Regions:
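Thr-biased low-complexity repeat/linker tracts and other Thr-enriched repetitive architectures
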Residues: 2-31, 35-58, 62-71, 75-78, ...
Length: 185
């Protein structure tokens, strides 16, 4: 990978590249440098990230420069993070996770799905949750069900609910809001 450029990565295709990156650890990824990681990531699609799995995606995410990661855009970030679980997210810097969430839109959160959104949200503290604001939290939580909210715990759910207003709750929809309330203590 160190001797390849973006054209070479494109010639490999996303599937082969995903398999290659899956077999690298975080130190190997860091040794490649930010520019190479960005080129590799831009070449991969949702299928390649699925081949990599959540742990390898987390390693890729934490070794990439924060600005470059956000520069990939919400769609790419959603395809990456939908393969991550709460334990994968916990290996990342909370500020990085917050910035990733800020870069995503409602369609990106829908792509991630409730389990990945819950994993992302479970790593955020009160400051991060309030920093996102009610509208962004509504975009995230409308993709979650009662089981997803259970991962968060009552205190985190309380922080989220305190940040949201009636319009945000309406945007969530009844099913998601019911799952949220069910898991409050």
């Amino acid at each position: 990978a160190a001797t390849m450029n973006i054209t070479n990565f494109q010639q490999m295709g996303g599937t082969a590249l995903g398999g290659m990156v899956k077999n690298m650890d975080a130190s190997n990824m860091a040794a490649l440098g930010d520019a190479k990681l960005v080129d590799m990531t831009k070449t991969m699609d949702a299928g390649a990230f699925s081949i990599m799995g959540g742990a390898a995606v987390a390693d890729l995410t934490k070794t990439m420069d924060a600005a470059s990661l956000i520069g990939l855009g919400g769609g790419k970030l959603a395809n990456m993070t939908k393969n991550m679980n709460v334990n994968n997210f916990k290996t990342l810097d909370p500020t990085r996770i917050l910035n990733m969430a800020k870069a995503m839109n409602p369609a990106n959160f829908a792509t991630m799905g409730g389990t990945a959104v819950a994993g992302m949200t479970a790593t955020m503290d009160t400051t991060a949750l309030t920093g996102l604001g009610g509208a962004k939290l509504a975009d995230m939580t409308k993709n979650m069900n009662a089981s997803n909210f259970a991962v968060l715990g009552g205190a985190r759910i309380k922080d989220m609910a305190a940040t949201m207003n009636i319009t945000n709750f309406q945007q969530m929809g009844g099913t998601a809001l019911g799952g949220m309330v069910k898991n409050m203590d």
